[in-house]
């Protein structure tokens, strides 16, 4: 049986966006892609994805957090993954395990860029309860 679940991927780096979309399609999921926060918001106004993957820093330093917040506000049950290189580039650390970060980071999983496809596949399946 073909998988009909759709994953929204938003990243301003076209190479990262293409690679992530390629991998997710190879996992058997449909993908919708957007190259910026604004385009992601437009898609979210019309489509309810089964899961969303957002880059953190796009046109603004907090674009991914804003998209996560808006996604959870409109579709509270849609899992959100933030994939970013911010932690390795800036040394900033975010944790979905601490109360302070969990209050304002409306994501279900936070992953550093460079994630192996098998790790990403495992996280997607876990969040979608596959």
Question: What is each stretch, according to the model?
Answer:
Residues 47-53, 58:
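Active-site beta3 strand of CheY-like receiver
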Residues 11-12, 113:
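Acidic di-acidic motifs
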Residues 14-32:
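Two-component/phosphorelay signaling modules centered on CheY-like receiver
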Residues 1-6, 112-130:
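Non-catalytic signal-transmission and effector/linker regions of two-component phosphorelay proteins
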Residues 42, 65-76, 96-99:
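Short amphipathic alpha-helix used as the core "switch/output" element in two-component signaling
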Residues 10-11, 34, 52:
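Conserved sequence signature across two-component system core domains
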Residues 66, 86-112, 118-122:
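Alpha4 helix (beta4-alpha4-beta5 surface) of REC/receiver domains from two-component response regulators
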Residues 33-42, 63-64:
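Helix N-cap/capping motif at the beta->alpha junctions
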């Amino acid at each position: 049986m073909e998988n009909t679940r759709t994953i929204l991927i938003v990243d301003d780096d076209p190479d990262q966006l293409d690679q992530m979309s390629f991998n997710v399609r190879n996992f058997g999921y449909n993908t919708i892609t957007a190259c910026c926060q604004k385009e992601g918001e437009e898609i979210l106004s019309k489509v309810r994805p089964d899961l969303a993957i957002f880059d953190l820093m796009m046109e603004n330093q907090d674009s991914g957090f804003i998209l996560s917040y808006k996604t959870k506000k409109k579709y509270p049950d849609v899992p959100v993954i933030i994939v970013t290189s911010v932690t390795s580039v800036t040394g900033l650390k975010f944790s979905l395990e601490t109360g302070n970060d969990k209050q304002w980071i409306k994501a279900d999983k936070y992953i550093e860029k460079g994630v192996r496809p098998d790790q990403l596949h495992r996280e997607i399946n876990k969040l979608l309860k596959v």
